[in-house]
Amino acid sequence: MLPILLSVALLALSSARSPFFDLEDANSNSAEKFLRPPPGGGPPRPPPPEESQGEGHQKRPRPPGDGPEQGPAPPGARPPPGPPPPGPPPPGPAPPGARPPPGPPPPGPPPPGPAPPGARPPPGPPPPGPPPPGPAPPGARPPPGPPPPGPPPPGPAPPGARPPPGPPPPGPPPPGPAPPGARPPPGPPPPGPPPPGPAPPGARPPPGPPPPGPPPPGPAPPGARPPPGPPPPGPPPPGPAPPGARPPPGPPPLGPPPPGPAPPGARPPPGPPPPGPPPPGPAPPGARPPPGPPPPGPPPPGPAPPGARPPPGPPPPGPPPPGPAPPGARPPPGPPPPGPPPPGPAPPGARPPPGPPPPGPPPPGPAPPGARPPPGPPPPGPPPPGPAPPGARPPPGPPPPGPPPPGPAPPGARPPPPPPPPADEPQQGPAPSGDKPKKKPPPPAGPPPPGPPSPGPAPPGARPPPGPPPPGPPPPGPAPPGARPPPGPPPPGPPPPGPAPPGARPPPGPPPPGPPPPGPAPPGARPPPGPPPPGPPPPGPAPPGARPPPGPPPPGPPPPGPAPPGARPPPGPPPPGPPPPGPAPPGARPPPGPPPPGPPPPGPAPPGARPPPGPPPPGPPPPGPAPPGARPPPGPPPPGPPPPGPAPPGARPPPGPPPPPPGPSPPRPPPGPPPQ
């Protein structure tokens, strides 16, 4: 390897020399002075200046002179041997190198290696080696040793060569950095390596990273002093790139978001960072998948930050996105669309926020259910049914809607796109872009059956007892796939979103609560507990708390239903709970038919309430907008919150409870009064 590297370095140096007459020729002159004397050719030459000019060699017919400018005209003839001079350079550096220390000389070879390898980048590691050489150069520059360093300068030449041997640039960059790096210490070399490292990862994801590495190189010479800055950039890209690729691990996205965002995100501010990450992640990773994961990742980030702030509930949303991501991916990011509604609600939702949320959730639940059979209405209908009695009481009805959103949230959200199809689909499809379209086209079709399969994911609920779920199922199950299957229903779904069913009961006002839970969960908490109250009903009920109070339990069941885990815990509740989940899978499939009727009624019911439901309809539109918003998908997280309830874990013990605790618990009491 070393021989090869040396030869490559020599070639690069020879090619690069012409461009760098000042550095290399000066060094070469010194080298000639030192080396030529033995040959005797050097001393006779009175015009070293010309040589320094570099033209002297060319003008001179002397083959020796023409050989490597290194004094070793004879050896110079052996251009390769010229490298030996580099080898000597190490020795030469030895003196100067000794200053840095001989260690550098060994690196010296690396430099050559790096130059070529640098290009390779894998040798990128050599770049670190070069850094030492780089130091050699610096050191060499300081002292005549330069002749040997001269070769290192060639390293810089590589920059010149960079044009050609871009790789050298990397090497040089390290060298350049090395100088500064050397000053600080090898530490800089690490930066150099980072580029290389990035190069590998960067190359993997895209060579883009290597470019960064090179950029540092370019900077290295001039930038070397500042280079550190460049290195960071270089690393960030690499980091993002690699992480981005990993992004899959939404977490990395988070991490990346900080990094990537750090630069970009930081620019905007944290809030922006989430978006920032999405772009970054999406850009590299996003492009790759553009994995809904990134969106989820970003959502988590965005939600996480905001959501986390509001309460952990948001984190659940984050997970929901992930969960949805899988399921969502299946159905499609459709969830984001609904998410968008929440998203809008989440960020914007918080602003309105409940108003939008209701629509948002309705869209999710309704969209999904409505879309599916339009069982969506059923979801509301079913939840309302159960809630209806209790729902009327508290208007848990809204909470049920909330649950529906949950189920829908993950899958429902995805489904919603179908409903949107008429209005939102364009947006969602566009917003989701290819991803959604991919899934959507199939979903709209008979997929409903498949949709139920998605509900299958709801399996948890299904596990509880699909039987009851059937009614409920339509909502949840339908939500996921259902929505996809028959967009036509979705329109009704929107009316349902009108959760109107429940909304009508209380009137939409309650629906807002329902949605608030979702939206509120993340933003809802932020915006105001008011929404949470409703939210709490679902959450509270979702948790066991609802169970405790029988009265609430009825609503609770709906929430429990939402709370997949809750449903699991107690079959009784599960039935309702199942309705959303369980039904989702099996229930949705079979019951959907009935649900459709149910939904229609719900829709109609909402119609009466529709006046208010009217907002829900907007809600669906928001979903459409959400598509764009969907990208923010954070919205999904909002649904996520409902999902959180659904989120087996989240809902099961903590998340579900946490939401209630945050604002829900207090809101919970209020909700009772509000309904009344």
From Swiss-Prot:
Signal recorded as keyword: yes
Compartment(s) where it occurs, according to its Swiss-Prot or TrEMBL record: Secreted
Modified residues (Phosphoserine): S28, S30
Keyword Phosphoprotein: yes
Superkingdom in the source lineage: Eukaryota
Region of interest: Disordered: 29-676
GO MF, one example: hormone activity
Tissue spec. comment: Acinar cells and secretory granules of the parotid gland.
Propeptide residues, chain positions: 409-457
Keywords from the named record: Hormone, Phosphoprotein, Repeat, Secreted, Signal
Pro residues bias spans: 36-50, 71-424, 442-676
Purpose of the protein: The parotid hormone stimulates dentinal fluid transport in teeth.
Protein name (record): Basic proline-rich protein
